[in-house]
Amino acid sequence: DWPKGLVMDMWGSATIRTAGEEFAMALHLAGLSPRWDDGSDRVSGFDILPLALLNRPRIDVTLRVSGLFRDMFPGLAQLFEAAIAKLAERPESAADNPYLVQTPRVFGPRPGSYGLGIGAAMDDYSDEARAAAGEAWLAASSYAIDARGEITYARDALETQLTRADSFVHLQDLPETDLLMAEDYAAHEAGFAAAMQRLGKGGAAALYHLDATRPDQPRARTLTEELARVVRARAANPDWATGMMAHGFRGAAEIAATLDHLAAFAHLAGVVPDHLFDLMFDATLGRDDLVDFMQDANPQALAALRARFDALHRAGLWSSRRNSVLAELGSPA
């Protein structure tokens, strides 16, 4: 089945690098195509693709844009809203055209505001903190951008679109990074999952991470699949950890931060299976040489690493049945 409602997480930096690949995807999913200006090679408008040519229903796309995207590409937000206004006028059935229901579909943070403001809620593994993270995501996404570029508070419209969503998509184009190298990925992707849970729709939307690091071979993976790929390829790869040992204090900090970011996905979205944390434990505290290195180079990072594993275990986000792990954590077997 085709997805019925899809939320796209739009970042300004990625839009610059890909020349708007994500936005073009949003247009195509809605059954639209960009109209190009021959003189400048810029997008000057849009064309509506007929259903007969699409051979599928139009997909209800909601754009959650970052503050940077809002400021750098106001024309794209306006273009999308203008296009869906025209779709609302089409003589098509509601089953084929969800845009017959007229409502804002481009949302972002308050003017002048950036980021999601999840903060400490990512590190506190209580239900209350998860709810606070979801509320922060909603609050930072509650301003609608219309076809004239006017930005208004539209929390109710946002929540309505989210409750209809069955898919969430984030695209990554940078080959030199991954979703465990910065907390922003967890804040945006797992934060959406926390927001859905806040609305009583936890698990209703599938979470997808699109890999566009090789433009000629794009890959779509579930968020769990992408996390497993990154853990096995880098985070739990002994060669990577050994490489970090050459960077002293900073290398030890990167090892600890990688676990922090994986933990945030587990806390906010529940998408990290136990065996991935087992792999992380084996690759870090399970290596005597790595523990000795961190103790010498950055004992604070080592203490943070141990505390993070312990907090995950105590919160029930990671359950290990291995006595050696439980002994290292100081927990009863």
Regions found by a protein language model. Give the residues of each.
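Ligand/cofactor-recognition surfaces for anionic moieties
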Residues: 1-333
